[in-house]
């Protein structure tokens, strides 16, 4: 043990515990007199553990940024569709001026600007937004044989 050349020796459990951290996850379930023990042991190097935590944080930040940007919506940009629709495509310009678009999300443009469509007389007929006149209401009731109740 003096000043001689270093001697090779076998790896002991002390060496393993020096270079590795031991994480033991112990999960206990009790289902009506039935005990299930799940012991899961993971051996990782300390350096690798830090790297894995940093990588996990990077992935979490990327996912958070993506979901914040997307907003979990079908259309991830500002909803300008109805502005374009009413300015360029709508069939009746006077109707568009009388009942401007209202709402957000899937209800944009399907109602007039008054909340819950109260006081607005518009409806969709054959894919066109039209004013609901007494004559049109009568025609709808006659065609379908039921009283027209606007929702």
Curated annotation (Swiss-Prot):
One of its GO terms (cellular component) is viral capsid. Residues 23-43, 46-66 are annotated as: Hydrophobic. Keywords: Capsid protein, Disulfide bond, Late protein, Virion. It comes from the Viruses. It is found in: Virion. The keyword Disulfide bond applies. Its main location: virion. The keyword Transmembrane helix does not apply. One of the minor capsid proteins that constitute a network internal to the major capsid proteins and outside the lipid membrane. The minor capsid protein P12 does not serve a cross-linking function between neighboring capsomers, it may play a role in the viral capsid assembly. Interacts with the major capsid protein. The hydrophobic regions might anchor the protein in the underlying inner membrane. This is Minor capsid protein P12. The lineage of its organism: Viruses, Varidnaviria, Bamfordvirae, Nucleocytoviricota, Megaviricetes.
């Amino acid at each position: 043990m003096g000043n001689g050349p270093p001697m090779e020796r076998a790896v002991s459990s002390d060496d393993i515990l020096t270079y590795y951290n031991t994480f033991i996850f112990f999960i206990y379930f009790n289902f009506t007199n039935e005990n299930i023990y799940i012991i899961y042991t993971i051996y990782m190097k300390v350096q690798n553990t830090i790297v894995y935590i940093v990588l996990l944080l990077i992935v979490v930040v990327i996912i958070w940024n993506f979901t914040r940007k997307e907003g979990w919506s079908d259309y991830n940009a500002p909803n300008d569709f109805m502005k374009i629709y009413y300015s360029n495509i709508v069939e009746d310009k006077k109707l568009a001026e009388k009942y401007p678009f209202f709402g957000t999300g899937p209800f944009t443009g399907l109602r007039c600007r008054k909340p819950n469509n109260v006081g607005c007389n518009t409806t969709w007929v054959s894919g066109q937004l039209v004013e609901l006149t007494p004559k049109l209401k009568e025609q709808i009731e006659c065609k379908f044989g039921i009283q027209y109740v606007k929702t």
